[in-house]
């Protein structure tokens, strides 16, 4: 694969360039110097705050300007190739991108809260042995517009509003976000901009397998999402077996990077731990997790393995999960994530373009 495409995502040869993914600076350049500066802001707010699906819907613009823009640009949302609906209300979207590749996005309604799980890459290069996405390998990284477009499309399709504090975004779908950091940062700036999509930083989380240099880089961003770390083992040896990329990024160095990460007053680091029967789910593992995280402002999310074809591990019994949680939560906030969308392959670690 072309390395520049792998790094920054698809640019393509389309006749009309997408507006989704552009920030205010990009939009001003697209409009040209003959348009007043406030026109860019009108487009920006209409697309991200107003969720306009096409240029016709941006009624604040003069008709001639809309016509001129339409000759060169389109809003540029992905296309729904297929929608899978779970008995628990979860929806898995297979989205077709401009180059014909597909990526998956999941909506998880839960009473008064909705969560959209979005992807940062088509496939994933990290090769976690318990994750079905790893079986795809990496096809390419997504552009900022393709990342934001997932949110806009799912929000529009389900009449979700970004205000009111009920919508959460988690970048825990396909891909390793920190290996596409440039586009992830640009996308999250738009999602967190009050004039853009307008979410609070408390409502957006990016998950990483532990790409140490990029953790520090993300920490320097003035406006950034919350950070979650995929831990998944209590020893270096076990972690390297389950997550081969960690042979490059060692556990002690990861914990040091987490210690140095600048947390806001309200913030904790989240550590995610996928429990695999007989592999990393013992009481001794739980005690080692407590020791590893003892000097961090952290919480732990436990995920009992969501099974799938090609995954050589089993889900632990509920009693084993409860025992693990009870040990960890004596020292740290510890929660068990409820599986969502198991019947449509929409749960954590199951996103591999499966047809149900």
UniProtKB/Swiss-Prot annotation:
Its main location: cytoplasm. PROSITE patterns: RADICAL_SAM. GO terms for cellular component: cytoplasm. The keyword ATP-binding does not apply. Belongs to the radical SAM superfamily. RlmN family. Coiled coil: none annotated. Specifically methylates position 2 of adenine 2503 in 23S rRNA and position 2 of adenine 37 in tRNAs. Binds 1 [4Fe-4S] cluster. The cluster is coordinated with 3 cysteines and an exchangeable S-adenosyl-L-methionine. It catalyses: adenosine(2503) in 23S rRNA + 2 reduced [2Fe-2S]-[ferredoxin] + 2 S-adenosyl-L-methionine = 2-methyladenosine(2503) in 23S rRNA + 5'-deoxyadenosine + L-methionine + 2 oxidized [2Fe-2S]-[ferredoxin] + S-adenosyl-L-homocysteine; adenosine(37) in tRNA + 2 reduced [2Fe-2S]-[ferredoxin] + 2 S-adenosyl-L-methionine = 2-methyladenosine(37) in tRNA + 5'-deoxyadenosine + L-methionine + 2 oxidized [2Fe-2S]-[ferredoxin] + S-adenosyl-L-homocysteine. This is Probable dual-specificity RNA methyltransferase RlmN. The gene is rlmN. [4Fe-4S] cluster binds at residues 124, 128, 131.
